[in-house]
């Protein structure tokens, strides 16, 4: 018996799973876009946790 020899089975991995990968990428970018839009609202623009606030790009109120 040959225990060290592996047999290559033609199992499709990428073909049935590509819709999930594409959906994951789309979801990631939609959440990133929503987070950026939320960071730039009036409610969160002057929050000290905002990266734009730390960089000195604070929106001044008139």
UniProtKB/Swiss-Prot annotation:
InterPro entries: ATP_synth_F0_jsu. Keywords: ATP synthesis, CF(0), Hydrogen ion transport, Ion transport, Membrane, Mitochondrion, Mitochondrion inner membrane, Transmembrane, Transmembrane helix, Transport. The keyword Transmembrane helix applies. It is a single-pass membrane protein. It is found in: Mitochondrion inner membrane. It comes from the Eukaryota. The chain crosses the membrane at residues 13-32. GO terms for cellular component: mitochondrial inner membrane; proton-transporting ATP synthase complex. Its main location: mitochondrion. GO terms for molecular function: proton-transporting ATP synthase activity, rotational mechanism. GO terms for biological process: mitochondrial proton-transporting ATP synthase complex assembly; proton motive force-driven ATP synthesis. The keyword Transmembrane applies. F-type ATP synthases have 2 components, the catalytic core F(1) and the membrane-embedded component F(0), linked together by a central stalk and a peripheral stalk. The central stalk, also called rotor shaft, is often seen as part of F(1). The peripheral stalk is seen as part of F(0). F(0) contains the membrane channel next to the rotor. F-type ATP synthases form dimers but each monomer functions independently in ATP generation. Belongs to the ATPase j subunit family. Mitochondrial membrane ATP synthase (F(1)F(0) ATP synthase or Complex V) produces ATP from ADP in the presence of a proton gradient across the membrane which is generated by electron transport complexes of the respiratory chain. F-type ATP synthases consist of two structural domains, F(1) - containing the extramembraneous catalytic core, and F(0) - containing the membrane proton channel, linked together by a central stalk and a peripheral stalk. This is ATP synthase subunit J, mitochondrial. It comes from Yarrowia lipolytica (strain CLIB 122 / E 150). The lineage of its organism: Eukaryota, Fungi, Dikarya, Ascomycota, Saccharomycotina.
């Amino acid at each position: 018996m040959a225990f060290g020899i592996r047999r290559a089975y033609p199992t499709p991995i990428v073909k049935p799973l590509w819709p999930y990968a594409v959906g994951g990428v789309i979801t990631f970018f939609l959440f990133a876009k929503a987070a950026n839009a939320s960071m730039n609202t009036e409610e969160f623009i002057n929050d000290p946790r905002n990266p734009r606030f730390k960089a000195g790009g604070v929106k001044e109120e008139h």
